[in-house]
């Protein structure tokens, strides 16, 4: 009996460790894929730094972090739709362009390129990013 326990116990422990490592590995792969795709977002560095900070912060908090939380919970067998994420990234450029226009030449009540214009345009920008997240969430799995 003691011999069986010395053989079975290490095998049981190895099986438990293997079962715990597999979902974490898959989650890391899904997260790594999403982060790689988000790193392809290239905003124009010639724009004002406080504008770029606001634009990047919106993308990070309204898109990247929520999507990473979702794909981090996917099982290893789940297929992540890279096309869905790439489509979302192309729409990010359109939303960011709209944000920039409201911050710069389309600003009505304040001087163009001012912090006041940025504040006025930010709410609409974040709302559009949240809507994009809701759309993207529906198509993340293939």
UniProtKB/Swiss-Prot annotation:
* Tissues where this protein is expressed: Female salivary gland (at protein level).
Query: Can you tell which superkingdom this protein's organism belongs to?
Result: Eukaryota
Q: Which residues form the signal peptide?
A: 1-26
Annotated disulfide bonds: 84-139, 107-117
Protein purpose = Salivary protein that potently inhibits the alternative pathway of complement system activation in the host while having no inhibitory effect on the classical or lectin pathways. Binds and stabilizes activated host C3-convertase complex C3bBb (C3-CFB) and inhibits its convertase activity. Enhances accumulation of C3bBb on immobilized properdin.
Look up the further comments and give them.
The protein is equally effective in normal human and properdin-depleted serum indicating that properdin is not involved in its inhibitory mechanism.
Q: Could you tell me what this protein is called?
A: gSG7 salivary protein
Question: Which organism is this protein's natural source?
Answer: Anopheles albimanus
């Amino acid at each position: 009996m003691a011999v069986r326990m010395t053989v079975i116990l290490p095998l049981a422990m190895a099986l438990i460790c293997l079962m715990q490592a597999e979902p974490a590995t898959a989650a890391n792969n899904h997260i790594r894929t999403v982060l790689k795709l988000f790193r392809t977002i290239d905003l124009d560095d010639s724009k004002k730094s406080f504008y770029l900070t606001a634009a990047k912060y919106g993308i990070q908090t309204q898109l990247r972090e929520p999507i990473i939380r979702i794909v981090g919970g996917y099982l290893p067998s789940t297929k992540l739709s890279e096309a869905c994420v790439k489509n979302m990234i192309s729409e990010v450029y359109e939303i960011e362009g709209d944000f920039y226009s409201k911050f710069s030449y389309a600003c009505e009540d304040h001087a163009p390129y001012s912090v006041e214009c940025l504040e006025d345009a930010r709410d609409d920008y974040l709302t559009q990013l949240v809507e994009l997240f809701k759309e993207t969430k529906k198509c993340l799995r293939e």
